[in-house]
Curated annotation (Swiss-Prot):
Organism: Neisseria gonorrhoeae (strain ATCC 700825 / FA 1090)
Lineage: Bacteria, Pseudomonadati, Pseudomonadota, Betaproteobacteria, Neisseriales
GO BP of this protein: methylation
SUPFAM superfamilies with a match to the protein in the record: S-adenosyl-L-methionine-dependent methyltransferases (SSF53335)
Name listed for the protein in its UniProt record: Release factor glutamine methyltransferase
NCBIfam families attached to this UniProt entry: hemK_fam, RF_mod_PrmC
Pfam families recorded: MTS, PrmC_N
Gene behind the chain: prmC
Amino acid sequence: MTFDEWLGLSKLPKIEARMLLQYVSEYTRVQLLTRGGEEMPDEIRQRADRLAQRRLNGEPVAYILGVREFYGRRFTVNPNVLIPRPETEHLVEAVLARLPENGRVWDLGTGSGAVAVTVALERPDAFVRASDISTPALETARKNAADLGARVEFAHGSWFDTDMPSERQWDIIVSNPPYIENGDKHLSQGDLRFEPQIALTDFSDGLSCIRTLAQGAPDRLAEGGFLLLEHGFDQGAAVRGVLAENGFSGVEILPDLAGLDRVTLGKYMKHLK
């Protein structure tokens, strides 16, 4: 069987089948195109078959390959961390647009470290901290920071209760917290079945972690600092209300490329609280 024949017989979408074949053959996309008529070595075909079956069983391609591209960089991912989504790049853009020179950023619930590492690489002058309650997730984030050459301080703990000081000093506090409501049908569908539930749902109404962040951020933000939160497409108004209730001013809801509510942010001004 040739490479092209395997691609043709695969039950996967062509783009996914090609990604798996590139992975097992270690060919580039161009090499695979030019060598498509060559016979597949048995070892490569057997590995490709095994990976294809994993994908047919629903396992995300990112977990099968162990990598996911985010903001133009390749991040290590595994079942201990949420797979970075393109929508989260809008959260990064919002952070970068508001980060002062030599600013301080704290990414809570960092997971793979995609947000923290990206901000640190895009703004080497900034001091970036990343924290997570999951030790395996922090190990993955540390690896990504090391592999990509990002300077990030890591802390372990639940939200603001970490093993590092959390005094008022942060220009930006950012998070993509668990925001799917407990029992949501999507948790048992598609890629979400394989991702860590603790990174997806708060096991409550989808807003409990957001409330915790909005309540705790004012005591950690510098005057004029920002809290930025990613959330579900139908949660914009609710998150805006949570931020307003906790003393944030100038609350904005930012859309993603599809025009859906995706990021809500607010500014902390002590004299307005």
